Amino acid sequence: MKKHLLALAVLALAAGGAFAQANDTIAKAKASGVITQGVRDSSGALAFTLGDGKYTGFHYEVCQHIIANIEKAIGKKLDVKYQLVTSQNRIPLVQNGTVDIECGSTTNNATRQKDVTFINTVYVEEVRIAVKANSGITSIAQLNGKSVATTTGTTSVQLLRKNERATGVDFKEVFGKDHADSFLLLESGRADAFVMDGQILAGNISTAKNPADFKIVGEVLSVEPIAIMIRKDDPAFKKLGDDTVAAMVKSGEMAKLYDKWFMQPIPPKNAKVGLPASDATKAAWANLNDKPAEDYAKK
């Protein structure tokens, strides 16, 4: 009996160790020599594809700095693999270990914090409305009876419905499978408006065939922290990520990176997003934190 109990105890310890290892991304990377970065194909200047399996963007580059610091910590180069994620599957893929660090356009909110952890915020977004310039739409009230596009798995339409100015406004929701698809709904006339993060709207407009045909209008629906996502219960990786972004802010590298991606011409069309750092983003740099969107709403 004692031997049986001892065997069970050993198995329990082994299982606990395996669980800890699964959530220790740095140890996992050291053992395997591989780290998998979750990427997006059309998340505005934060993260997008260049084609041929290549990705780039503001959050993509921040993640590259974090990965470089993992390599320094473990003393060897890593094979960085890229996993394309969507708004629907990004959280499950981080949870199940397919993706080690997700570098896209994910809102840090209280619900998601139950499932994943976020690196301290370095980009704060304003959710806005994009329309065709000749639509005559300038406010939420004018969306009554209209079709409004958003991307499956995002929170934007819920924010629109919760806005006090939307009381009594009845609109139809249409969904794109990704942000580019949602913008296409607007561009093709299948939607009268596209509700999404301002930089995603601005980025899609800047690369449209005729950017002047579109504009961003109306009230700011919400202010949301957009952050890099990792697995829960991984304090070593959380600290390394937070330390990395803190060093980038302190050195001025973060501000330079922001200017590069939001104020200068960027690939693939050499177009400029033209979105200066908001006061909320500057405040996040001045006081780095991982507070959820709900805390921003209280202000």
Where would I find each of the regions flagged by the language model?
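Extracytoplasmic small-molecule ligand-binding "clamshell" domains
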Residues: A22-E102
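Bilobed "Venus flytrap"/periplasmic-binding protein-like clamshell domains
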Residues: T36-A45, Y55-K72, T107, V124-H179, ...
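Periplasmic-binding protein-like
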Residues: D41, Y123-V131, S206-V245, Q264-N287
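Extended ligand-binding regions for polar small-molecule ligands
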Residues: E61-N69, A141, K146-S147, T152-T154, ...
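Short beta-strand-to-loop elements that line the ligand-binding cleft
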Residues: I74-T86, V169-D178, G218
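Acidic, polar ligand-binding/catalytic clefts
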Residues: G75-Q142, A283-K291
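A ligand-binding cleft/hinge motif common to bilobed small-molecule-binding domains
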Residues: N89, G104-K114, L159-A166, L185-S188, ...
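Ligand-binding clefts/hinges and TM-proximal coupling segments of bilobed small-molecule sensing domains
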Residues: Q158-V174, A212-F214, A246-K299
